Amino acid sequence: NSNITIDGKISSDKVWSNVKPITSLTQITPNFGSPISEDTQIRIAYNDFYFYVSVICFDSSPEKIQVGDSRRDAALNDEDSFLFIIDTFNDQQNGFLFGTNSDGKEFDAQINNEGVGNRSSNRQQGGVIGGTNINWDASWDVAVEKGSYGWSAEFAIPLRSIRFSPGKTKTWGINFQRNISKNTEIA
């Protein structure tokens, strides 16, 4: 129930040291089904007000980490980045997408209909790409730290910024993605 200081410094934070990391990411490209080429540690925590995610993106060549456009909601696909979708209703249809790069760029979007989108032109709006609405901007925080190990990021998402069913015992879905540009890798 404690608050986490959002500063990107994960290894020195006592709260994160008590959370077992998720480490098994699988490549989508270039080697579908193979383990991710660089170690990645993801941790999740929450309290009554925030949903927290931390990631340590280890990199054997941190000098090769690439960063692209720094504008909010600019695409993160062609740079070193980390993204996740929270499926608060666990329906595998809708969710909230958050991401960043090693410079701390904010990326967020609302996912509808598995991201497939609405085919009716009268319902499409600017900023909607398929079923991904990048015009949706929540209030949340992210901080990053770079080092000889690679980079790390901490996210704090206010629960009031996302929709979910009330109740104490709810199951949410979550999906993570790490992009490693030097390997043209998505995991």
Task: Annotate each predicted stretch with a short phrase.
Residues 1-187:
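Structural preference for beta-rich elements and adjacent junctions enriched in aromatics
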